[in-house]
Amino acid sequence: MRILILGSGVVGTASAYYLAKAGHEVTVLDRQRAAGMETSFANAGQVSPGYSAPWAGPGIPVKAIKWLLMHHRPLVVWPSLDPKLYLWLAKMLANCTEEAYRRNKARMVALAEYSRDALDALRSETGIAYDERMLGTLQLFRTRKQLDHVHSDTEVLDAHNVRYELLDPSGCIRAEPALARVRDKFVGGLRLPGDETGDAHIFTRNLADICARQGVTFRYGVTVEGLRHEAGRITGVALAGGEIATADIYVAAMGSYTPALLAPLGIRLPVYPVKGYSLTLPITDPDAAPRSTVMDETYKVAITRLGERIRVGGTAELAGFDLSLREPRRATLAHSVGDLFPAGGDISKATFWTGLRPMTPDGTPIIGPTKLDNLFTNTGHGTLGWTMACGSGRVLADLIGGRAPDIDTADLSVARYAEAA
C-alpha cells in the first residue's frame, strides 16, 4: 500500500522504517529541512522503560503546588484563556488515583519494554549509531521521603519483570562514580540497569538515511494545511501551494500539532504541548561526568552523557505553543547539573533549547486507527517519544498490515477516550 506519514520526528521516522520493512510504499512529509528537527532535536537522551510512568498519580495535585512554589521549579503554568488547557488538566486530575496510576503505568512500561527490545533489534539489523550507551538509569533521591515513596513504582516493575536495584549512597556511587564528590547531596537511588541512552536527533537523522536507502521518500519543507475527506475516508492531504498529496493510508505523527490537524474531522485528541528545556554542554573531565543518565528526582531533571557531551533535560511548562527560551528554566537545569556534577562539564559553553512534548492526560500515547477507515495516529508520547518510538512504529505497522501486534494494544487508540470514540 501507499502510505503517507505526516511528521519526521523520531516517532514518524520509526514508523516509516517498520512500514517500509513490511513492504509498503512510504512517503514522509515534514515542514522542517530534515528529520528530527523539533521535539526530537535535543531531548534528554533517555531510552528508559523502567522510568516510564504517567505524570498523573496519587499525591500529584499536592506535589504540583509545592513544585510551583519552588525557586527552581520543575513545573510552570502560565495563565491562559485556552479552554483546551483546562480540559486537559481536568482529565489529568481524573487520572491521579492509585488505580488509574497503576493501570496507566503498567501499559506504559509494557510498551516501553517492547520498544527498547525493538530498538535493540533495529540496531543489530542496521548497525545504526547515535552515541548510544547501555548503562542504565539512576533515579537519585535527595530526601528520605522520596526514597520511601518509590515502592509503588517497584511493585509495577515487579509485575512486569523489569530489573531494578534499590541503592544506598555507596551503591549510587558504584553506579555513578562521579557522585562520590557530592555524597552529602543524596540519600539513595533506584537503578534501572535495562535502560539505555542515546542522541534521539542523531538516531532520527541516521534512521531517515536508512529508510531512504530502503525506498522511503522524504519531502522536507512541506507545510500540511489540512486533510480532505469523503465518505468516512481521507482522500488527500492539502499542502501549502495548492498541492493535494494522496495515498491509501495516512498516519498523523505530528506530535503536539496533531490535534489541530484532526479536529476538523471531528476527532478530538486530548494531547497538549508540555514545554521542556535542555542544556547541552561539553565534558571537561570524563571522570567527573555521569556515565549514563542520572535523574534528579527533586528537580525532575535528567542528566545524560551523550558521547563527549552532557545533556541536561527537564521542566514541564504549560505555555501553549510558545517556544521562547526562558532564563529561569535555564537556571534550574544549570543548578541541577552543577550541584551533582560540578566539575563534569563547561556550563559557560552550554547550548539552550526548548521543545514541545505531546502529552496525554494518562501518559499513554495514542496509536492506531481512528473513526476514518484509512487514518491512523502515532502521537501523544509526552516525554517518552524516544523511549517508545521503535515499539510504537512496529505496533503501527502491524495494525496497518492487519497483523496482531506482539503486545496488547487494546487501550492505545483514541477510542479509550469515550468522547472521541
UniProtKB/Swiss-Prot annotation:
> Its GO CC terms?
cytoplasm; plasma membrane
Task: Give the intrachain disulfide bonds.
Answer: none
Check the record and name the Pfam families matching this protein. Answer: DAO
What is the name of the protein in this document? Answer: D-amino acid dehydrogenase
Q: What does this protein do?
A: Oxidative deamination of D-amino acids.
The Enzyme Commission number assigned here is 1.4.99.-
Decide whether keyword Cytoplasm is in the record: no
Q: Which family does it belong to?
A: Belongs to the DadA oxidoreductase family.
A molecular-function term among this protein's GO annotations: D-amino-acid dehydrogenase activity
Which keywords does the record carry? FAD, Flavoprotein, Oxidoreductase
Give me any GO biological process, just one.
D-alanine catabolic process
Query: What does this protein need as cofactor?
Result: FAD
Summarize where FAD binds, as residue positions: 3-17
Main enzyme class: oxidoreductase
* Pathway in which this enzyme or protein is active: Amino-acid degradation; D-alanine degradation; NH(3) and pyruvate from D-alanine: step 1/1
Q: Does the keyword Flavoprotein apply?
A: yes
Q: Where is the signal peptide?
A: none
Report the domain of life of the source organism.
Bacteria
Tell me what reaction this enzyme catalyses. Answer: a D-alpha-amino acid + A + H2O = a 2-oxocarboxylate + AH2 + NH4(+)
